[in-house]
Amino acid sequence: MAAGKEIRGKIKSVENTKKITKAMEMVAASKMRKAQERMRAARPYSDKIRNVAANLSQANPEYTHAFMESNDAKATGFIVVTTDKGLCGGLNTNVLRAVTSKLKDLQAAGHDALAVAIGNKGLGFLNRVGAKVVSHATQLGDKPHLEKLIGPVKVLLDAYSEGKINAVYLCYTKFINTMRQEPVVEQLLPLTAAHLQADKDQHGWDYIYEPDAQTVIDDLLLRYVEALIYQAVAENMASEQSARMVAMKAATDNAGSVIGELKLIYNKTRQAAITKELSEIVAGAAAV
């Protein structure tokens, strides 16, 4: 029964793996709910800033912030948001494939690329492909804080304000629902009219701003861009936990199938061994 013993060992091993994947599935489900709550809680903040900035910009059309001006620089910035850990299906692969496609288009046009990596997976990828990583933020944990993002991202924002890069793209995985997440590569800078469009139900504004509207616009647009980046990180984290939960559920289900197949093989092997022993006993009795 050496074969039977080996099969029992495999069954035990797969059962242990199944327990691990089931536990990871439950942990991911809990984290997913919390990540979705953070993602939804961040939206009203960015929406309110956008409305205020939009109304201010419309009231002061003669003033154009640096984030709204285009330039002819031969370099482009990328903020690449990925996960710190794996075991989340093709989440990182899909967004990095989209980044690779965009990088190839820029290289074909003769443009350089400067990147900020948020997450270990993106940092490792950008280093492997030889991209110029100007800063990075990793180990953000389950609760991302804007303070950890501002420093690394500010490098690209300052470069755009100084005319060193012609655009900044935000690359992340957008959360659609628990079963669906989409890789996104969207233009962050320069800000367009679509970015600064007030809600239709907003009433006319007649406020006095101190020290002046221009200073308020400068501060609000920076906060708005930071809020968009934070929202992308929050969406990516919700997508990560959803993808991990689905991946671990699939692994748990597959482990169950493997266990069933191994038990069937074990039973057949055991039955064959018993049949063989009985045949030998009968043959021995017949010989006597």
From Swiss-Prot:
Subcellular localization: Cell inner membrane
Q: Which PROSITE patterns match?
A: ATPASE_GAMMA (PS00153)
Q: What is this protein called?
A: ATP synthase gamma chain
Output the GO biological process annotations, alphabetical, semicolon-separated.
proton motive force-driven plasma membrane ATP synthesis
Q: Does the keyword Cell membrane apply?
A: yes
What is this protein for, i.e. what is its function? Produces ATP from ADP in the presence of a proton gradient across the membrane. The gamma chain is believed to be important in regulating ATPase activity and the flow of protons through the CF(0) complex.
Q: How does it assemble?
A: F-type ATPases have 2 components, CF(1) - the catalytic core - and CF(0) - the membrane proton channel. CF(1) has five subunits: alpha(3), beta(3), gamma(1), delta(1), epsilon(1). CF(0) has three main subunits: a, b and c.
Membrane topology type, per the record? Peripheral membrane protein
